[in-house]
Amino acid sequence: MEKVGWYQLFNGKDLSGWVQKNGTAEYKVENGEIVGTTVLKSPNSFLCTEMEFENFILELEFNVDSQLNSGIQIRSISSPLIMKGRVHGYQVEIDPSFRAWTGGIYDEARRGWLYTLAQNEPARNAFHQGEWNKIRIEAIGDTIRTWIN
């Protein structure tokens, strides 16, 4: 496996290198941040990098509205031949709800929950509602690990 240094996915200026799939949410850049705005009654929307990665570590910061559900799709695909192009695959959950499963693994549009945080109280308490949070995702081989804050 060839090691490559850190690569900046977002340039802080515009959405070059990114494409929206499914749904009608609006994505824009404000003050060097990607801002997504939900559209009522729209199917799930996904902002996807145009690059593909096999083994990777992804680190980012996020802040999510307490009324929304979100996540970070990894190892996911969108093909017009499968589910009419719906993005599907692993999602690292961003869950501001009372159950607090941020960092759990959900199989979007397929099998559902693969790893909840139901039995992991320290992980459930790591997410800070209404604040910026940091997430680290390691996807190496067939292992996916996540950390919050």
Predicted segments, located by residue:
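Carbohydrate-interacting regions of secretory-pathway proteins
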Residues: M1-N149
